[in-house]
């Protein structure tokens, strides 16, 4: 054997030895992380406290303020190296008195409808009533003549597509009816718009969510009705048995007000290089914000607690951020991004959990090809824990603005099973009782493990 071949052979042997050693060390560390989460985990009780002691946490509300203090106390309880509040400004919208809605049939009979105002909508200023004009798709409304719509209440009955395996794809296709429905209906002279709730089950829960107005387009009330009521109304409309729709909403917008993001850290050897993880502390005012996004909050809180408990010494500063105002403005995410840039920090990676507390399936990664190649190698370590999705593209609403300030940053998104998420999303049914303890704990363990590997290998 030549000296060159001998050196190459020895080099391969040494590389293989170290790779095997690293794999063994990492495999053991992941097992310790999962054991801590499943045996001594705090995530479920922390979620119980957030949901039951505080409840829904809409930006600008007293409950949102309580949640900020809750988050600060929780981080201090787990002895993070530093805990602090970052000032932001948030919009303030209130639902007011409970909404009411009815349909009147051609025979004069009234039937109650389960309805909720969309976030940001104006109120009806008393009882609003009118003839219904139905469209099965937002595009159909856009193509309608003004004479078909003017003076009427528009009903957009566009269902999420049950054929989609990933329910977020079905949601994404329908999101514009909620976000833009009021603008498109108002352009044609409608007096209000109601939409079919964005959810796959046929049930009685209306789902709220953000909507917007455009300058120069008259503002009209916007609301969602339950999928069960949408099915009923569609049948009545087709049979021409629906006389009119009546609704009353008391919601109002108020001036912006001060609020905070909550931040906790474990300092690394390279203290000015940051890897962050987080979710949004605010929620809509229906339900308890358990899956959206209480689960993401306690996932990341628990992940940092686990690494601290296991006495892991990070290379980079590991940071947890509880973002405020993701649901109706994203001022927490936007303010955080500009703030860390102004501090001169090197923000190298961020991970977000905002898809509920269901069984972990994997992660998405939005970064350079060189990082993605290392990222997919992590799959082997996660095989014992049944994670199998390692896809290109990732992140979330809260961490998205970091890309504007740090073009080379890598964003990660936690991907749990999606099949049940839109059963509860933005609805009264998004409560603590609908979160499974073990699934939640497995999610926290997966995130802690991913952050450990990011710190030790992906950005070493």
Give the predicted meaning of each segment:
Residues 305, 309, 422-460:
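His/Asp/Glu-rich mid-to-C-terminal helical/loop segments that flank catalytic regions of hydrolases
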Residues 27-61, 205-210, 219, 282, ...:
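N-terminal capping segment at the start of a domain
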Residues 1-27:
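Bacterial Sec-dependent N-terminal signal peptides
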Residues 110-112, 125, 220-225, 230-231, ...:
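Metal-dependent peptidase/peptidase-like ectodomains
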Residues 45, 305-331:
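Short helix-loop-beta-strand segments that form the rim/entrance of peptidase-like active sites
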Residues 48, 52-163:
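Noncatalytic luminal/extracellular "stalk/propeptide" segments of secretory-pathway proteins
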Residues 112-221:
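Extracellular/luminal Protease-associated
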Residues 28-30, 104-105, 111-146, 211-290, ...:
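Soluble metallo-hydrolase cores and metallopeptidase-like ectodomains found primarily
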């Amino acid at each position: 054997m030549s000296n060159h071949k001998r050196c190459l052979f020895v080099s391969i042997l040494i590389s293989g030895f170290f790779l095997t050693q690293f794999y063994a060390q990492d495999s053991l560390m992941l097992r310790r992380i999962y054991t801590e989460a499943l045996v001594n985990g705090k995530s479920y009780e922390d979620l119980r406290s957030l949901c039951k002691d505080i409840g829904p946490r809409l930006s600008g509300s007293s409950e949102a303020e309580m949640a900020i203090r809750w988050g600060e106390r929780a981080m201090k309880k787990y002895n993070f190296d530093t805990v602090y509040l970052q000032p932001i400004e948030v919009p303030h919208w209130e639902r007011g008195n409970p909404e009411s809605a009815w349909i009147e049939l051609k025979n004069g009979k009234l039937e109650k409808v389960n309805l909720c105002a969309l976030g940001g909508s104006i109120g009806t200023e008393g009882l609003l009533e009118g003839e219904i004009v139905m469209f099965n798709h937002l595009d159909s409304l856009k193509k309608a003549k003004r004479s078909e719509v003017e003076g009427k209440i528009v009903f957009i009955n566009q269902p999420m597509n049950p054929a989609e395996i990933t329910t977020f794809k079905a949601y994404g296709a329908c999101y514009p009816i909620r976000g833009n429905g009021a603008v498109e209906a108002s352009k044609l002279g409608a007096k209000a718009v109601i939409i079919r709730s964005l959810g796959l089950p046929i049930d009685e829960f209306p789902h709220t969510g953000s909507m917007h107005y455009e300058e120069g387009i008259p503002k009209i009330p916007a609301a969602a009705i339950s999928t069960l009521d949408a099915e009923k109304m569609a049948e009545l409309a087709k049979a021409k048995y629906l006389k009119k729709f009546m609704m009353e909403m008391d919601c109002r917008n108020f001036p912006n007000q001060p609020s905070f993001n909550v931040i906790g850290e474990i300092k690394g050897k390279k203290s000015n290089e940051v890897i962050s993880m987080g979710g949004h502390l605010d929620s809509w005012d229906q339900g308890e914000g358990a899956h959206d996004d209480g689960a993401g909050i306690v996932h990341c809180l628990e992940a940092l607690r686990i690494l601290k408990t296991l006495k892991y010494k990070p290379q980079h500063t590991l940071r947890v951020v509880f973002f405020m105002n993701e649901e109706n403005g994203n001022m927490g995410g936007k303010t955080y991004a500009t703030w860390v840039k102004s501090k001169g920090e090197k923000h190298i990676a961020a991970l977000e959990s905002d898809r509920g507390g269901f069984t972990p399936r994997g992660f998405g990664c939005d970064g350079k090809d060189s990082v993605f190649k290392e990222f997919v190698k992590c799959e082997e370590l996660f095989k014992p824990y049944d994670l199998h999705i390692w896809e290109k593209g990732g992140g979330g609403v809260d961490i998205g603005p970091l890309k504007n300030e740090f073009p080379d940053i890598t964003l990660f998104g936690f991907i749990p099973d999606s099949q049940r998420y839109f059963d509860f999303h933005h609805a009264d049914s998004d409560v603590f009782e609908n979160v499974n303890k073990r699934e939640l704990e497995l999610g926290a363990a997966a995130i802690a493990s991913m952050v450990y590997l990011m710190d030790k290998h992906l950005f070493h």
